[in-house]
Amino acid sequence: MQTTFRRILILFVGLLVPLFFACQSNSQVDAAPSAAPQLSASPAKLDPLPYDYAALEPYIDAQTMRLHHDKHHATYVNNINETLKAYPDLQKQSVDSLIQNLNQVPEAIRTKIRNNGGGHVNHTMFWQIMAPKAGGTPTGAVAKAIDQTFGSFDAFKQQFNKAGADRFGSGWAWLVSDRQGKLSITSTANQDNPLMSNPNAYPILGNDVWEHAYYLKYQNRRAEYLTNWWNVVNWQAVNQRYAQAQRK
């Protein structure tokens, strides 16, 4: 009798243990954070491209993508870490926070944080709002907002391309949103980000018009690069950023 009872008890415990660990596993999944953190400054890190170097062919060539990400973007990240070595308090902040509060950054390193922090934030967004087999017309809330603001997608593209073409030297063309969802087009020099000068101008789309972004394929034909770039815009990612802008 005791032997039978012992066997039943062992069988019962054997059934309960896997169930217990399964419940623990599920609770851990449910507790996982859903929001992506801002870019860390302790240390700053270069994430891999979300697609292959050749994935944006024929509009952006693989060699340009490799050099742009692995050399140019990597240099911005390395420079941030080198600059902040002597500033442990600043390492506790995100790179996003540093570039939006440049007046609080020590003057001795302010320009370096502006240039390299901006370069890191700008390029991180740039890789995310492009994708293979993307392009086409906008979708979702962004499509409606573009039509309401600019009249049509074609009119918007014309104004955006002009902002990129007219930017003398190096810089960026941007589509920004305020917290109410109002859109506007702007451009910045060098690696400046719109949030550096206007905390209510959240970038949801940006095109890099530095020569390193296009010169290997397009040489001095920036206008052609600007036109072809629309074939790789990831409108799903742009819509996500548009929603984020209104939650700021």
From Swiss-Prot:
Induction: Constitutively expressed. InterPro entries: Mn/Fe_SOD, Mn/Fe_SOD_BS, Mn/Fe_SOD_C, Mn/Fe_SOD_N, Mn/Fe_SOD_N_sf, SOD_C_sf. One of its GO terms (molecular function) is superoxide dismutase activity. One of its GO terms (cellular component) is cytoplasm. Its cofactor is Mn(2+). Destroys superoxide anion radicals which are normally produced within the cells and which are toxic to biological systems. Belongs to the iron/manganese superoxide dismutase family. This is Superoxide dismutase [Mn] 1. It comes from Leptolyngbya boryana.
